[in-house]
Amino acid sequence: EFDTASGAVVESKASLAGTAVNCAGGPTPWGSWLTCEETVSGPGGDNAYEHPHGYIFEVPANGRATAEPLVEMGRFVHEAVCVDPVTGVVYETEDQNAAGFYRFLPAEAGNLGAGGQLEMLAFSGMPQMDTRTAETGVWTPVHWVPIDDPDPVDATASSVFVQGFGGGGARFARLEGTWFAGTRAYIVSTTG
């Protein structure tokens, strides 16, 4: 807990354990935090992990987290998320050289554990668009490509991206932050 008036930390405690390489994540309109793992490491690697990683976890502002990965939101190199406060749709960035911009359509707004559909952004009429060479300042229609297997058994860093890209999804390079304002999700990319 942080006291904004005094600038002092009042209380500090762990809210989640058992995750790996957590990155930006983001807040939800219903008062929780989505923390994102920026790795797909798992058992059998050189890190001695018991469980696979590369997921999003929800951490309530008050109370205990379940430490259950939200597997239908995808297993990939996550960076950040933002949430549309009206629909509950979650937008997700991926931080690697060949990266996708994803959205998760929850089966039930505000209850991500109820499952849903993961999709990857595609530019209409420009399948497999490489945004590193795109023209700036041009509005382009988009659509979304379904990800049929958001939690592949032997996941690599590119497993989910390859599915979306194969369906015509766009390639970004190292997506970082994302924010939802008004009716739009904004994203920033490190290298295109």
Q: What kind of region is each of these model predictions?
A:
Residues 1-192:
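Sequence/structural signature of beta-propeller domains
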